[in-house]
Amino acid sequence: MNVFTLSWHYAWSKPLSAVLNVLVLALGLGSLAVILMAHQRVQQALERDVAGIDVVVGAKGSPLQLILAGVYHLDVPPGNIALADVEALRRHPQVAQLIPISLGDNVNGFRIVGTTPAYPALYGGTLASGQWWQAPMQAVLGADVAKTTGLRVGDRFAGLHGLGAGGHAHGDQPYVVSGVMAASQSVLDRLVLTGIESVWVVHETDMATDADDLAALQAEREITLALIRYSTPLAAVTFPRHVNAATNMQAAAPAYELSRLLRMLSAGAMCCVRWAWRWWGWPHSACSWRCGRPCA
């Protein structure tokens, strides 16, 4: 009598126990599959949003915080940097492209991002309706923003101060929706894009008490950060060092910070995979999880 015959007789002699064992096994395998698939989707989304960005320059602080705020829009930025300093970097011979980013307001929790048309082009953004902004206080909505807020081309809305819901509204400087972007499965879907001048107009008008204050604010304009693409691969070695040592800004490499972030996100999934390999006694050679360590 072989093992299959014994298993068959056992299952028929104790059907409830057999069903429960199969159910537990199915739940375990299903949970493991869900964890691995979710991790893979998160990793793909993170890698897609960082594509085309060699370095992010912003205020000194945590490099990971700068990447989370400037690339993924999941954190608060360390601070602002002077526009004059950014323009000096734009003229640097190792900089092929510099995209300014200004944050500070939101609508229904979705961030309003002041930038240039090069930013949506970075992710291959296209319009589902309307047109790109042509003047200050015109805004283009991401697909998720339009779906959640119900705003359409021609509608007006006021930005709320801060990067989360609950700030005071800039009711005297409303935005006009000029376009709605098509879904791109990128960070663009959950952003409101406008000209960088719009962010300056809103906050300078809100802060200035007279013409002298307004002129002073305009002379000392700032942005939140800059996304930079190198003109040569060699810049990856020298440019961040130059920014970190010779300026009051910091340069953070998205590729390096992304690897750190993925290591943190992988901790739970790796534990589940290693437990499964150990539980079922599968050899390490059968493990497709690239952890670099034995699974048992």
Task: Give, region by region, the residue ranges found by the protein language model.
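Loop-to-transmembrane-helix entry motif
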Residues: 14-18, 26, 49, 258-261, ...
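Mechanotransmission and gating elements of multispan inner-membrane complexes involved in transport
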Residues: 169-174, 180-269
